[in-house]
Amino acid sequence: MIKVVFMGTPDFSVPVLRRLIEDGYEVVGVVTQPDRPVGRKKVLTPTPVKVEAEKHGIPVLQPLKIREKDEYEKVLALEPDLIVTAAFGQIVPNEILEAPKYGCINVHASLLPELRGGAPIHYAIMEGKEKTGITIMYMVEKLDAGDILTQVEVEIEERETTGSLFDKLSEAGAHLLSKTVPLLIQGKLEPIKQNEEEVTFAYNIKREQEKIDWTKTGEEVYNHIRGLNPWPVAYTTLAGQVVKVWWGEKVPITEPAEAGTIVAIEEDGFVVATSNETGVKITELQPSGKKRMSCSQFLRGTKPEIGTKLGENA
């Protein structure tokens, strides 16, 4: 039986681990990030992958730094024939990459060489792409730069969010892995080098990227809102207060107006001007310190005026 070590951390990784177990591989260990304090009460919480591994009685390693000798030697002691990673969250050292008979492979949520990095799902939507996908490739020490083994495309729908695409890609990754591993073991795959001239990056989202830039086009603002839903959530400011914007709709604007100003107030939301003739009607938001709500609920208690400017005094 093929002995596999799985390395992964978030919800995205769980279907991949589950599929390895279902397909009959001997998962001799799981490597995941350390437990983290979560929520206002800072409750120490295990990763989704750790929770899944413990359901199946699989030993779990949680190195703070996998590159340290005493940590990676614990992985090597498991003597895996194959290592599979999916959103593990640390750069894996060569000592591990070179050890397994069948190598180390990674399930990455983009069509490499596009969108290398930790936030490919967010960026696919924020950049307005109509398709993305899964790549399974050999791992190297350089970020997401290994030779490609298999790929599958996944369509991005007009109203797709990072949350819905995350779920689709997670399942697509598990399915593609199920088809890829037997071919890899049988030596039937021809690795393809990535074209370095076509590389783009999707680095982890920073706080300053979450703010809506109303001077962009309506399409770009709409994609920004979708791409940060349900986490970390786009925001703007209204009357000096931070407001998270959970959802909006593209609407035509007939009269020119300064980007970021409210140009219409309707029953289900208010329309904000952008840099072109497409405005964005905010329909779901979350004022600072309050719960997420529909804009119609918000408008029952707060009455912004037409001409009010959003995005100031953040």
Curated annotation (Swiss-Prot):
Molecular function, one GO term: methionyl-tRNA formyltransferase activity
Residues engaged in binding (6S)-5,6,7,8-tetrahydrofolate: 110-113
Catalyzed reactions per annotation: L-methionyl-tRNA(fMet) + (6R)-10-formyltetrahydrofolate = N-formyl-L-methionyl-tRNA(fMet) + (6S)-5,6,7,8-tetrahydrofolate + H(+)
Coiled-coil ranges per UniProt: none
GO cellular component: cytosol
E.C. number: 2.1.2.9
Alphabetically ordered keywords of this record: Protein biosynthesis, Transferase
Repeat in keyword set: no
Pfam families the UniProt entry points to: Formyl_trans_C, Formyl_trans_N
Database matches in InterPro entries: Fmt (IPR005794), Formyl_trans_C (IPR005793), Formyl_trans_C_sf (IPR037022), Formyl_transf_N (IPR002376), Formyl_transf_N_sf (IPR036477), Formyl_transferase-like_C_sf (IPR011034), GART_AS (IPR001555), Met-tRNA-FMT_C (IPR044135)
Taxonomic superkingdom: Bacteria
PROSITE patterns reported for this sequence: GART (PS00373)
Keyword Cytoplasm: no
Task of the protein: Attaches a formyl group to the free amino group of methionyl-tRNA(fMet). The formyl group appears to play a dual role in the initiator identity of N-formylmethionyl-tRNA by promoting its recognition by IF2 and preventing the misappropriation of this tRNA by the elongation apparatus.
Family: Belongs to the Fmt family.
HAMAP family: Formyl_trans
PANTHER family assigned: METHIONYL-TRNA FORMYLTRANSFERASE, METHIONYL-TRNA FORMYLTRANSFERASE, MITOCHONDRIAL
NCBIfam families in UniProt: fmt (TIGR00460)
Annotated protein name in UniProt: Methionyl-tRNA formyltransferase
Organism listed in the record: Bacillus cereus (strain B4264)
Lineage, broadest ranks: Bacteria, Bacillati, Bacillota, Bacilli, Bacillales
